């Protein structure tokens, strides 16, 4: 096999490489136009005090690090990071555990289980704005069937999204409902790839269901769990529709995560340069998290 691969590699000459590059060039140009160019422009704007009310500010590079240094002394920015940390940690942990539990329950090949898998995926395939509107209705006392049912039982509950103590956790609950099927799907796919032979041998030796999971299935699916958690962690940093629809960052700033804070700086106060700097820092954070968790996942893999 190695000899065959070496022969193929040596058989590709400059003309063939040029032909391959020519074929890929349209895709490369499109990728650069849609992603790299806007990202580069965002970075350039972050080096200026850009605001639409002062056109000359778009080309003012006299203090290129002012926005980044200013963020370090901005209490609302640091508060938004803390809110983001609480939201990300709670949702990723909850979604990973729920996804793992649901995957274990649905790891069977029956018609009922197949139907249940489809039902479990419904929240994930809904447009995010639709999911947000569903929870807006459920959290609004005047129209919520949940609140009306509790009121009929003489157990009235105040709106969770207008209470500073519960608003963030209400968003975390809605986000978990919407996205735990994603982690379930990835973990379920990994569970179905676990070799049958070790499981059967362990059953013959009298291993319990918990022992089968802990010593055989969990080590095998651990990389998939890490990947699922990584994707959800990155998506939690991009959280926007639920917060925009349910609380608009309130009450006060209790649900104002970092990207929503950048949104308000750009579109409420027209501080484009500062908002761009926040967006660049968020992007750098996402890349750093991707590298860190990817490295941890590679080390924890039984094949790594």
PLM ranges: what are they?
Residues 1-15:
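Short, Lys/Arg-rich, polar N-terminal cytosolic tail immediately upstream
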Residues 16-304:
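A structural signal for multi-pass alpha-helical bundles of membrane permease subunits
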